[in-house]
From Swiss-Prot:
This is Small ribosomal subunit protein uS9. The lineage of its organism: Eukaryota, Fungi, Dikarya, Ascomycota, Saccharomycotina. Residues 134-143 have a biased composition (Basic residues). One of its GO terms (biological process) is translation. It comes from Kluyveromyces lactis (strain ATCC 8585 / CBS 2359 / DSM 70799 / NBRC 1267 / NRRL Y-1140 / WM37). Belongs to the universal ribosomal protein uS9 family. InterPro entries: Ribosomal_Su5_D2-typ_SF, Ribosomal_uS9, Ribosomal_uS9_CS, Ribsml_uS5_D2-typ_fold_subgr. GO terms for molecular function: RNA binding; structural constituent of ribosome. Residues 123-143 are annotated as: Disordered. NCBIfam families: PRK00474.1. The gene is RPS16. The keyword Iron does not apply. Keywords: Ribonucleoprotein, Ribosomal protein. GO terms for cellular component: cytosolic small ribosomal subunit. It holds the Pfam family Ribosomal_S9.
């Protein structure tokens, strides 16, 4: 039984998590079982295309990417998907191609947008007493 070379990576944004399985194939990219061309909303579809367009479609010609995304809203999911795809491509090139092409990919991604490879660490601030939220306070009366 021959095993297909594959890597598994993830991307996160807020509470959205995308897991990408990258393996040798013929250039298919699927998100939750449907082609990448059907990602909704349409305006954010180009955000998902960014990793593909940055390095050229020739890098994706001989690999298949399957992405499963859960949690969060539409925008968070799109950012998690693009991060998972970018990280998956870098990991695949590191493991199965060569170190030089991996470094070229990393350089291209980080020079364009750092969040393609590094997760956004911002999280909601916890609520404190004396107000309705993290920073807002209840109204104060002097009389």
């Amino acid at each position: 039984m021959s095993t297909v070379p594959s890597v598994q990576t993830f991307g996160k944004k807020k509470s959205a998590t995308a897991v990408a399985h990258v393996k040798a194939g013929k250039g298919l990219i699927k998100v939750n079982g449907s082609p990448i061309t059907l990602v909704q909303p349409e305006i954010l579809r180009f955000k998902v295309y960014e990793p593909l367009l940055l390095v050229g479609l020739d890098k994706f010609a001989n690999i298949d990417i399957r992405v499963k995304v859960t949690g969060g809203g539409h925008v968070s999911q799109v950012y998690a998907i693009r991060q998972a795809i970018a990280k998956g491509l870098v990991a695949y090139h590191q493991k199965f191609v060569d170190e030089q092409s991996k470094n070229e990919l990393k350089k291209a991604f980080t020079s364009y947008d750092r969040t393609l490879l590094i997760a956004d660490s911002r999280r909601p601030e916890p609520k404190k007493f004396g107000g309705r939220g993290a920073r807002s306070r209840f109204q104060k009366s002097y009389r």
